[in-house]
């Protein structure tokens, strides 16, 4: 084992990296509420793993989406557990994100020089809500269908470009297969990649600037 370690140490200096990760100074005022960002990250990782597992069985078509979800729940081994964990962790992620945002705001963590950290955090909050909106529609049941219809109709109130936004979100004039395809693509590809990018930026800035001091 030591030979493997020595091989990596010689080439990558892994000990210096490990020391940097494990020896970061933590201010004495930090309490359990400062862990809410980490809880949000853990929920995202659980979402990623369980969501990836369900893509093996889910069929993103208006004719088969609902039946494929039922198949996951009733026929796939532990499918009911995987989907339930996905739903529970989604709710927990939203809750942790909201509490984390309030904690940062109330403790002044958004102030100079951490403005960009706050901006990336707000963008991550928007992405989290977008996950909920797009994921809610994927079973394509009555609740999901009408939720999509209402949500995609909201931008129509915007002057000039409102109707164009609605058509872009729906993939056409009405809600149908094109809408489900776009929401599925956003939920499983676009939003996860954007979240990873902004999370990386968020964490790198936190590592660079450290945790904000007490009020």
From Swiss-Prot:
Pfam families: Cytochrome_B. It is found in: Cell inner membrane. Gene3D superfamilies: Cytochrome Bc1 Complex, Chain C (1.20.810.10). Its cofactor is heme b; heme c. The keyword Ligase does not apply. Heme b 2 binds at residues 86, 187. Binds 2 heme b groups non-covalently with two histidine residues as axial ligands. Binds one heme group covalently by a single cysteine link with no axial amino acid ligand. This heme was named heme ci. Heme b 1 binds at residues 100, 202. It is a multi-pass membrane protein. Keywords: Cell inner membrane, Cell membrane, Electron transport, Heme, Iron, Membrane, Metal-binding, Photosynthesis, Transmembrane, Transmembrane helix, Transport. Heme c binds at residue 35. CDD domains: Cytochrome_b_N. PANTHER family: CYTOCHROME B (PTHR19271:SF16). Belongs to the cytochrome b family. PetB subfamily. Heme 1 (or BH or b566) is high-potential and absorbs at about 566 nm, and heme 2 (or BL or b562) is low-potential and absorbs at about 562 nm. The 4 large subunits of the cytochrome b6-f complex are cytochrome b6, subunit IV (17 kDa polypeptide, PetD), cytochrome f and the Rieske protein, while the 4 small subunits are PetG, PetL, PetM and PetN. The complex functions as a dimer. This is Cytochrome b6. It comes from Gloeobacter violaceus (strain ATCC 29082 / PCC 7421).
